[in-house]
Amino acid sequence: MYRIYSALIEMIAASVFIIPIWCIYNKLRFRSWKLTAVYMVFGFYLSAVLALVGFPNIISLKIELTVNIIPFIHMIHDAVNACLNVLLFIPFGFFLPVLWKEFRSAKTLCIAGFAVTSFIEIAQIFTGRTTDIDDIIVNVAGALIGYLIAYCFTNAFTRRIVKDAKLSDFYIVCASVAFIMFFFQPFISSLLWEVVL
């Protein structure tokens, strides 16, 4: 429960930057408030994911190389955490094919899930946490489940919520959220924690 509460605080802190930046994007690039609103929701979700997995930030960098490359070891010993990681990436697998036609195949969706979760795991070298192959496996599994859920909603799958969503927007949203979470969000987050504690 505390982790969810913590992720909510971190997401609110990120939204202080996401909302105005996305509004600027809307003016310069997206040119659709509907599209911008959907991207904001996706951005909030990504910020919560990064907060939950312990994404590094400029305030608390700690380089420590701890790697597990043997699959299924930690998964077996900590099944609850493995299940939570699966749940964490289900929305990722749902968002992508609904928003972007490029992710309508399971293969491209899994590649995207693998790329994003690998980036997160490599980034954890700078947090002192363990970079774990099991996390990559369960996160991709969660993304695939989300994809299958989206596939069941044939109307949403065959007709995107926003038809003018471009693949380049996916990279912009992901890179912007990672940039915000690393450089700016920690300062607002520390202020919020002082208020709530």
Residue ranges of each PLM-predicted region?
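Bulky hydrophobic segments
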Residues: 1-122, 126-127, 151-197
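Membrane-interface catalytic loops of GT-C/OST-like multi-pass glycosylation enzymes that act
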Residues: 130-132
